[in-house]
Amino acid sequence: MIKLKHTLRYLLVLHLFCVASLPARAVDTLALEIVRRLDVLLEDSLLRHSQMGMYVYDISDDTLLYAHNELQLMRPASCQKVVTAVTALSLLGEDYKFRTGLYLDGFRQGGTFKGNIIVRAGFDPLLSSSEVTQLIDVLRQRGIKSIDGDLLLDLTMKDTLSRGSGWCWDDDDKLIRPLYLDGKPSFSAAFRTLLRKSGIQLKGRTRQRTLPKGAECVAEFQRPIADVLKPMMKESDNLCAEAVFYQLAAHSQKPRASAKEAVKYINALIDSIGLHAAHYRIADGSGLSLYNYATPELFGHLLRYAYRTPPVLPAFYESLPIYGKDGTLRKRNLAPHAIRNVHAKTGSVTGVSTLAGYCTTAHGHILCFAIFNQGLIRAAHGRAFQDRVLEALTSGLPAAEVPQEAIVDTNKVETTW
């Protein structure tokens, strides 16, 4: 059943991409028109006092359609999450699970457990009270009514840093700790409350300790990576992004995995797709860091890689915001032909607005694109420019320019699905 589900998801995404090609003359004419439109946009007054880099690749034709300042190093902002997501799906796979374990170290004597209860953190950013209650229910099923011992929290999944490298001191984002409950880092008090509500008394105190050898895993909650990618990408959730970033780090199997370990895997992927990781700087998984530097070209290559890699594409594509429909693109509607067509990640920090993703041209060609606007007084100006680019990419030819053979009688078109 699971394999069938994955197959159907993949076929669905392929169906979205596979559009019947129109005659080559019409496609070539549209490509030239798109280039002309983008050339005109380079005269936009916004670019007189700010910087812009763009990379547009025709995946269907396997050709570079347009590039401007594509090699300039710029801050990707939350488009950094594209790098994190693609690397995670490539390295860990779409079946990867975030794991939170409940362990016992001791013995039961009647309704009392003599020993410690341990929660092993797996940096699940979405862990909820109801899910932890499911773990606690296992204790009740064993007849445990009281615990004569301590609550141990094993937080060794990641290093002890609570902020990413290059984060601003006044950022109001959540601290990155490996154990959250209902989006809050105050796990201990909430866990004790849930125990009490379940009729279990915990007599000891809370301590941070490594999981003792020989401790028994009595329950484990697992969350598919796709469930974390969706809020990470669609809503640009920074905590989810850092959680995925540290799953990469933990892949090294080293205790207290650090951001440096995650960066090594990202750099390895960049090198493997034909670019040189030394030309860029990766500092975190969310894009909050001011130390991140990348190019529009890098994002174009990563998007091409994701599109052409079956284990990556379905979960990645499904996680992207859809223009005019959901996520951080739900309120964008100034590019009519982009609505429900463009699937892309947004990025925004002070002075920066970015956009990277996929769209389909009027003649059915799949494009990947990256647009980086920097040096902005108002991010809205960058978004408006990007909307004009999207309309240029997705709208068709003016009626007077459509080659005769490109006019299709839709009444005679048969669709099978």
Regions found by a protein language model. Give the residues of each.
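C-terminal soluble interaction/assembly domains
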Residues: 281-417
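Active-site SXXK
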Residues: 62, 76-95, 151, 190-191, ...
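A small/polar active-site loop signature that marks catalytic segments
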Residues: 181-319
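Bacterial N-terminal signal peptides
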Residues: 10-20
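Beta-lactamase-like hydrolase cores
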Residues: 24-60, 64-73, 135-141
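Acidic/histidine-enriched alpha-helical segments
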Residues: 53, 99-105, 148-161, 202-214, ...
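Active-site-adjacent helix/loop patches that line small-molecule binding or acyl-intermediate pockets
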Residues: 100-106, 112-195, 223-265, 294
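Bacterial N-terminal signal peptides that target proteins for export
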Residues: 2-11
